[in-house]
Amino acid sequence: MADVKKVVLAYSGGLDTSVILKWLQDTYNCEVVTFTADLGQGEEVEPARAKARAMGVREIYIDDLREEFVRDFVYPMFRANTVYEGEYLLGTSIARPLIAKRLIEIANETGADAISHGATGKGNDQVRFELGAYALKPGVKVIAPWREWDLLSREKLMDYAEKHGIPIERHGKKKSPYSMDANLLHISYEGGVLEDTWTEHEEDMWKWTASPESAPDAPTYIELTYRKGDIVAIDGKEMTPAQVLTELNRVGGINGIGRLDIVENRYVGMKSRGCYETPGGTIMLKAHRAIESITLDREVAHLKDELMPKYASLIYTGYWWSPERLMLQQMIDASQVNVNGVVRLKLYKGNVVVVGRKSDDSLFDANIATFEEDGGAYNQADAAGFIKLNALRMRIAANKGRSLS
């Protein structure tokens, strides 16, 4: 292990990564640089600085990445209407490429020869972090302590921390029974009673959203302005990407929007139950499809829908920096040139209802689509030839006696 002189650690300041910090120092006899990302998780990140300093860390990075996260990762993903396995809005998955990118940048800045993370050997995050790291710095060494050590329970971690003088709170405030991960897009819950797929989640688990039953009895109306597929204003007020998502989380949470309880297929092979709150993302998905419905050509819209599951899978499995994801992104972004306009939504007790959409780039032609007299805008007699031509192959098959059953 003498080949490792300096390691950049993705550090939260919690029990797991604090133990990892000390374990790296002792096991590899190396210098550790800590990196703490503020992705809008809602927790104070500065205590991580004090804890790292107390453990002898000299180079400490605490970065506010909220704007970059939403602008360069969340927004591009939502241009594709991305959903994994029909439901999951990829709140955890989309944060990992940015963390990997910043780990490598700091490694380059500090001359570190390795990076380290606290993802376990059972989950997807180890794959996401490491695929990103290798794509951005092929020769980097990655240290994943959960795949090396025998500290495989919380109690063993606590004992290690006490033995090595790592500041912890064994008898502090009550710890959540769930494993949680949060950023500006979502908060996730795993473990505890959720490991029984028949057991209903507890109401007090949810942190961001009101229950639909207790949400306001009066609906909330909002208008979202789109420019090239991205939201740039709410109710006419221009906002940055992070401000947009923060406000949508707030108003969506009040109205009980964005709760999800699913069993998903992890990349490593197992099924895992997770509960998610994604109020802002749920609103964004509904609104984006609405503005696309009047601005996208039919075949472009259908092609996007065909490509989306593959795009979603690439993000879920950690291939954000792959050539195929980058290729798909160029196609998706090209489709958004005319996705401009305003969507009006009604938020009510867990529901997002589209009640209006308008655009100077709209392909909706009321003169042609009307059920009333159209003044010759559309010749209905043209449909006869259209139908006969499209039926030709089936007519030929029928004349040949081909069976239809």
Curated annotation (Swiss-Prot):
Q: Enzyme group, top EC level?
A: ligase
Q: What is its EC number?
A: 6.3.4.5
InterPro entries recorded for this chain?
Arginosuc_syn_C, Arginosuc_syn_N, Arginosuc_synth, Arginosuc_synth_CS, Arginosuc_synth_type_1_subfam, AS_cat/multimer_dom_body, Rossmann-like_a/b/a_fold
Q: Does the keyword Lyase apply?
A: no
From its record, what is one biological process in GO terms? urea cycle
Gene source species: Pseudomonas paraeruginosa (strain DSM 24068 / PA7)
The name under which this protein is listed is: Argininosuccinate synthase
Which Pfam families does its entry note? Arginosuc_syn_C, Arginosuc_synth
